[in-house]
C-alpha cells in the first residue's frame, strides 16, 4: 500500500529538525512526485473534458510541491544524477518549464 501522505508528514518533520538533510529533501520530493504520477495514471485521457483538465491541474500541483525539494537535493548532490534527473525532467516537462528543462539537457 502506498502511504504518500504518511511519508510526506514524516519527512516534513525531519526537515523541520534539519532543513538541509539532503536525503529527506529527496524523499519528500519523490513522495510528491510519485503521488502525482500515481494520480495521473488513474486519469482517463480526454483533453476536452473539464474534469480531466482539473485533475491534470492536481497532478501539476503535486509536481510543483515536489520540485523545490528535488531541486534542493540536486544542489546538494549534483553528482547523484541518477536520482534527481528523471523526476525533475518529467516535472519540468509537465509544467512547461523550458528554461529549467534546457539546463538539465546541458
What is each residue range found by the language model?
Residues 13-14, 73:
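Canonical positions in the second alpha-helix
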Residues 17, 76-77:
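Structural marker of alpha-solenoid helical repeat scaffolds
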Residues 21, 80-81:
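Residue-level recognition of tetratricopeptide repeat
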Residues 34-69:
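Short coil/linker segments at helix-helix boundaries
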